[in-house]
Amino acid sequence: MCLIVFAWRVVPGVPLIAAANRDEYFDRASQAAGPWEENPHVVAGRDLKAGGSWMGVTRPDGPECQWPANVSPLRARCQDGGFAPVETADKAPSRFAAITNIRAPDDFDPQAPSRGMLVSNFLSATMSARDYVEQIRPGAKAYNGFNLVLCDGEELVWFSNRGEPDARNGQPLAPGVYGLSNALLDSPWPKVVRTKAQFASLLCLGAPEEAYFEMLADTTRAPDQRLPETGVPLERERQLSAVKIESPDYGTRTSTVVKVYAEAPAVLHEQVIR
């Protein structure tokens, strides 16, 4: 996963909404999102090379579970240019996990363990998001750089093994809208800033799901003077600056919209691009 915007407790009845693009090399085999045969309550894509995932949810009643037809629309409570927090007393029945890599080619270890297993292991577990972070924290430096976003139905936690300077690292996030790419949470990369603002606008408008997929299909590249410097060649930096990445060997392979409901199983809709 290389770009994810998400809203936590700003939409009544829907504690978590996320929209994301997964960017990957085209020759890396993967499986589209669906229930996992060995663990049917997990609904996620799968990396067929290392066995982990980049994003997924749990549906506690398995692949045949149903949800009400009249669940809340995706409309946030917007006020004074921001969002009114929405408190939900009950724990949502589904879990959510997503990961992005931190782009640092000079700090990449090809022998490091698979970061995708951090997602699949959380989805298969029952511990809280904070407890899971504390479990993996001692060995986190062994992985290449990553950001994890974890929801246990009660709290949403962001954790990065490169995020020590940020006080939010490993702690429950406050209600709000967030953006994450291949740097730390809310880093002001052009595509993060732009997509986060558009996502917030769609939430205030109560836009249909199709609008979120249109947002994720934006191929606009950032001007050179606004590109981050991450250690890759300039032309690659230009390619990677788009929300939807297009290049001969690497690009956006799936777009996904996830809704974690307060009183119904989570819904994950994925568009496979390549």
Where are these regions (language model features)?
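N-terminal nucleophile
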Residues: 1-78, 83-274
